[in-house]
Curated annotation (Swiss-Prot):
One of its GO terms (molecular function) is metal ion binding. This is Outer capsid glycoprotein VP7. Homotrimer; disulfide-linked. 2 Ca(2+) ions bound at each subunit interface in the trimer hold the trimer together. Interacts with the intermediate capsid protein VP6. Interacts with the outer capsid protein VP5*. Ca(2+) 1 binds at D95, G206, T214, E216. It comes from the Viruses. Glycans are attached at N69, N238. It comes from Rotavirus A (strain RVA/Human/United Kingdom/ST3/1975/G4P2A[6]) (RV-A). The lineage of its organism: Viruses, Riboviria, Orthornavirae, Duplornaviricota, Resentoviricetes. It is found in: Virion; Host endoplasmic reticulum lumen. The keyword Calcium applies. N-glycosylated. Transmembrane segments: none annotated. Ca(2+) 2 binds at Q177, D228, V229, D231, D301. Belongs to the rotavirus VP7 family.
Amino acid sequence: MYGIEYTTVLFYLISFVLVSYILKTIIKIMDYIIYRITFVIVVLSVLSNAQNYGINLPITGSMDTAYANSTQDNNFLFSTLCLYYPSEAPTQISDTEWKDTLSQLFLTKGWPTGSVYFNEYSNVLEFSIDPKLYCDYNVVLIRFVSGEELDISELADLILNEWLCNPMDITLYYYQQTGEANKWISMGSSCTVKVCPLNTQTLGIGCQTTNTATFETVADSEKLAIIDVVDSVNHKLNITSTTCTIRNCNKLGPRENVAIIQVGGSNILDITADPTTSPQTERMMRVNWKKWWQVFYTVVDYINQIVQVMSKRSRSLDSSSFYYRV
């Protein structure tokens, strides 16, 4: 009997020693693996210099939020300026190095060489369709031409504000404007827009829906027209479809990185009286028309005062911002 008890005690002692040895071996192996992995991670981190990304956080706010004026002294060292001008300007200047000359003059005002971009456009229509407002600050020179006051005024309303637009199919649907910020924008080489307001029975009010000659004309042979009709009333529309397009748009707010300089004209065109234009700092100004060199010299001289009433934006804006923006 004593032999059996000694054997049992000896078995448990051997088992305990064996288990202890196995556990110590496992711990040593785990320590070795952990130390190795830690060492590899540290070495790779030093060598890779990678960005550390955290968890995915929800994005709040809108890119179209109207930012406070961010222009500060010496801010131009890391800002870009786009200057837009009609094609008649370089034709009159007739100097192949005129842009280099202006770049050197802008340098004296704190704008480094390479930060100012010169962009030419042929006419109001071309610019309104595809403005390419890509810079931190965008200054547009518009030559005042008698007879085109309305096109210029509406171009100013278009590019000084953000618009959200959708195409309109006027052959299939009636349309109504839902508020003061809701407008119809037509563009083309010659836009004539006619409307017929409808009652609740879809019968014309003062017009016949089957006879476009009875429709009211709201735009006649214009390149750019921003149409405003009575809100909450359906309208049947008719346009010169071969030379014109029309879109249903909502004005979202001011596009604060754009300023317009009217060149010539007895009075400056004013769009701030529009009830859809929120109170804002005037970003449309006028300079006297003499010669294009004189105009550009004036712009260079006052460029820093001009951008002080603007706000730098962090993204590019082009025609998509008021056509199919989402």
